[in-house]
UniProtKB/Swiss-Prot annotation:
Biological source species: Candida glabrata (strain ATCC 2001 / BCRC 20586 / JCM 3761 / NBRC 0622 / NRRL Y-65 / CBS 138)
Protein name, per record: Mitochondrial distribution and morphology protein 12
Renumbered residue ranges of the record's region Disordered: 74-98
Membrane topology: Peripheral membrane protein
Pfam family, one: MMM1
A Gene Ontology molecular function term of the record: lipid binding
This protein's record includes keyword Endoplasmic reticulum: yes
Major place of residence: mitochondrion
Protein's job: Component of the ERMES/MDM complex, which serves as a molecular tether to connect the endoplasmic reticulum (ER) and mitochondria. Components of this complex are involved in the control of mitochondrial shape and protein biogenesis, and function in nonvesicular lipid trafficking between the ER and mitochondria. MDM12 is required for the interaction of the ER-resident membrane protein MMM1 and the outer mitochondrial membrane-resident beta-barrel protein MDM10.
PROSITE patterns named among the record's database cross-references: SMP
Subunit structure: Component of the ER-mitochondria encounter structure (ERMES) or MDM complex, composed of MMM1, MDM10, MDM12 and MDM34. A MMM1 homodimer associates with one molecule of MDM12 on each side in a pairwise head-to-tail manner, and the SMP-LTD domains of MMM1 and MDM12 generate a continuous hydrophobic tunnel for phospholipid trafficking.
């Protein structure tokens, strides 16, 4: 069963796009950068106008991992506060009882197939460091544009305790996005990577373009460094999404007051 989402409303949410920029910039600031680059910064992010295709594959009860995560959060809040109220109104802080989220009939989990080949875009700036003829001989400002992003994955979306949990499970075979680094599972549509830890890329394809001054467009050494920088950014973006979204990690949206 397929359904639509209000992509326009999502793309116009300035708080969400700001949080994405802040999250990625915090990640880039923590990276150990190679000697030929410094100061990578995401300066613009846009969801675009093309919405993803979403197909519902299964409806079930949420995984126990999500209940455990909510309970752990309650426990941490209880440790930092002398008074805490559970969802049923009991004073957990004073009684000393452990906060437990009870399973309810309204708790739901969706297994969905998420396919995106849209016009989402990212713009980054960076400084390319030329270390010849001497170290840090020159720095060149670069503008890096990323577009044509392709994703096709199975995803869990769980709702419980007024919270939504989102986690990517694995890539799905796709005639447009498949490449030589993946093999098809003969028993189903799921992609199996050649290495176990690479069961999911999340980002399967993207277009990356770098603007550099005319003076250096024909300089072989500079162009090689630009190519290395592009590969570095692509890999780190994939690593970031794996770390934040790929199971056993997830994104948690809390709708409690």
């Amino acid at each position: 069963m397929s359904f639509e989402i209000n992509w326009e409303k999502l793309s116009s949410d300035s708080d969400l796009t700001s949080n994405i920029r802040e999250g990625l910039n915090g990640y880039f600031q923590e990276l150990e950068l190679p000697s030929y680059v410094r100061a990578i910064e995401l300066v613009d992010f846009g969801f675009g106008k093309i919405a993803p295709n979403i197909t519902l594959r299964e409806i079930s009860s949420p995984l126990q991992d999500f209940y455990d995560a909510v309970n752990e959060e309650y426990e941490e809040d209880n440790e930092t506060s002398s008074e805490m109220h559970g969802r049923d109104g009991q004073n957990v802080g004073e009684s000393g009882e452990e906060a437990v989220v009870e399973k309810k009939e309204t708790d739901t989990q969706f297994l969905i197939e998420f396919e995106y080949k849209g016009d989402m875009s990212l713009t980054l700036t960076a400084e390319l460091v030329l270390n010849y003829p001497v170290e840090r001989f020159m720095t060149l400002p670069l503008k890096i544009s990323i577009s044509n992003i392709g994703l096709h994955s199975l995803c869990l979306v769980s709702y419980l305790a007024k919270q939504v949990f989102i986690s990517m499970l694995c890539d799905v075979s796709d005639p447009v996005l498949d490449d030589v680094d993946c093999v098809l599972d003969p028993n189903g549509p799921v992609l199996l990577a050649n290495k176990p830890l690479e069961r999911i890329s999340i980002i399967r394809s993207m277009k990356i373009e770098t603007e550099i001054g005319d003076r250096f467009k024909d300089d072989g050494s500079t162009l090689r460094s630009v190519g290395q920088l592009e590969e570095f950014i692509v890999q780190k973006l994939k690593d970031f999404l794996r770390k934040e979204l790929a199971w056993p990690s997830w994104v948690n949206l809390d709708f409690n007051d």
